[in-house]
Amino acid sequence: MKIYIDGEWRDSSSGETIKKYNPSTGEVLDTFPAATRNDVDAAIDSAEDAFKRWSDMTSMERSKILYKALELISKDKDQLTDLLIKENGKVKREAMDETEGVIDQLQYYTEFERKLTGDIVEGTSNKRKIFQYKVPYGIVIAITPWNFPAAMVIRKLAPALLTGNTVILKPSSDTPLTAEWLVKKFVDAGIPKGVLNLITGKGSEIGDYIVEHKKVSLITMTGSTSTGQRIMEKASKNMAKLILELGGKAPFMVWKDANIERALKSLVWAKYLNVGQSCIAAERLYIHEDIYDEFMKKFIEVSKRIKLGDPESSDMGPLINKSAVETTEKYVDIARSSGYKILLGGKKPELSGKYKNGYFYEPTIIENVPQDSPLFQEEIFGPVIGAESVSSVDELYEKANDSKYGLASYLFTEDPELIFEASEKIRFGELYVNMPGPEASQGYHTGFRLTGQAGEGSKYGISEYLKLKNVYVDYSRGNLSISTVNDDLFKNL
């Protein structure tokens, strides 16, 4: 693959490349350029040159290009699905689902262009008005993760481009090929030179440089909390606007009156989707003591049936890389050494053929996990979940909220009073009641505490890419009177 700068596909200026591995087999899938600071400068200069032309276009004109990209992606959606399977390790049904999500998101944003409005506000007299315009920030750096490498690219690119910003896309080094595929569709759709640039490479080499660049106006990043904190530190030098979607530690709460089958299906989705590599993945399981044994028995049985291996026919894919496997093993080792009860899994599976070297890990269920354990306090990002019983709503709220993160949460109950009370008591940006995700395009994806700041999706997410500009107008005739200025100063001029 190549990077894309100033309307040209090119190699890194150093010629250096990095290997990309297939998570399912451990085999080399491709190589991609390791961009340099010179490449970053070239991309930023190109984006700066293109900004005036792009922002001067109407939102309708920009939307037409996005819509053409939507048509091209829809036409070749099977290619995207296959790429997600190979590069990310997704099983086929998950890859297909993400592809459809990409199409839905892009359609949502292309249809929003007629809703980009400002306000006219009354001034201090009847002949004064305040015109509040929404204008693009300028150059946007979009840093995207590997866990949903297509959906997250679109969730950042589409609103940024629609609102008149120019973009430099920096995808994860674990999924650069998906980003390249999507950028090609925008190029084929006729996006002008410099409006969209693609940079790949090591964050350690270009990460700090790109986010602290003086010409960058907005940075949007989905990733770890530690990375987000570093970006905040570096970007503060130039006061760049930040949209940061970071860590999560979702509580999955099942009350005594819950529909067990509905809760089980949703838990399988929330825990094992993408092998638990999701910021909204269920990582803490709280079940009412009256149904705890019944629920856990069924959850274990369902988890035993999950097939690993061939993405065409399996239920759960591999972790993204060797490091992710080691991290998962670290938390399971903590459980073992601490005496927690491992009810299922806790090891890598024994697979044969080309999948034997893949980064697979078995569904793992652990109980007797204390609230202060790393398994309940730190984001694991793997197919591991700790379980605990609760006896009261106060205990439920206290334990659910006991997290440094505050992104997604799940509640299963038939009690309307509990539903509405929990919607106020649970301090998370998203509460899914009697359903799994996924987040809808028209929903606002945001969180509390160390989950980040600002948000994405919906009309609120689009507004994050626009700066409110105020124009104060006095259209009265005659002399102007200002209370703090002496009119005598202007006599006989």
Curated annotation (Swiss-Prot):
Optimum pH is 6.6. Keywords: NADP, Oxidoreductase. The record marks 147 as: Transition state stabilizer. It comes from the Archaea. The active site is at residues 245, 279. Optimum temperature is 63 degrees Celsius. InterPro entries: Ald_DH/histidinol_DH, Ald_DH_C, Ald_DH_CS_GLU, Ald_DH_N, Aldehyde_DH_dom, Aldehyde_DH_Superfamily, NADP-Glyceraldehyde_DH. The keyword Kinase does not apply. It catalyses: D-glyceraldehyde + NADP(+) + H2O = (R)-glycerate + NADPH + 2 H(+). Belongs to the aldehyde dehydrogenase family. Glyceraldehyde dehydrogenase subfamily. Pfam families: Aldedh. GO terms for biological process: Entner-Doudoroff pathway through 6-phosphogluconate; gamma-aminobutyric acid catabolic process; glycolytic process; protein homotetramerization. Homotetramer. Dimer of dimers. NADP(+) binds at residues 144-147, 155, 170-174, 202-208, 223-246, 279, 379-381. One of its GO terms (molecular function) is glyceraldehyde dehydrogenase (NADP+) activity. Stable for 2 hours at 60 degrees Celsius but activity is decreased to less than 50 percent within 15 minutes at 70 degrees Celsius. It is an enzyme of class 1 (oxidoreductase). It comes from Picrophilus torridus (strain ATCC 700027 / DSM 9790 / JCM 10055 / NBRC 100828 / KAW 2/3). Pathway: Carbohydrate degradation; glycolysis. SUPFAM superfamilies: ALDH-like (SSF53720). Substrate binds at residues 147, 155, 279. Gene3D superfamilies: Aldehyde Dehydrogenase, Chain A, domain 1 (3.40.605.10), Aldehyde Dehydrogenase, Chain A, domain 2 (3.40.309.10). Disulfide bonds: none annotated. NADP-dependent dehydrogenase of the nED (non-phosphorylated Entner-Doudoroff) pathway with highest activity towards glyceraldehydes (e.g. D,L-glyceraldehyde and D-glyceraldehyde), to a lesser extent towards D,L-glyceraldehyde-3-phosphate and glycolaldehyde, but no activity towards aliphatic or aromatic aldehydes. This is D-glyceraldehyde dehydrogenase (NADP(+)). Its EC number is 1.2.1.89.
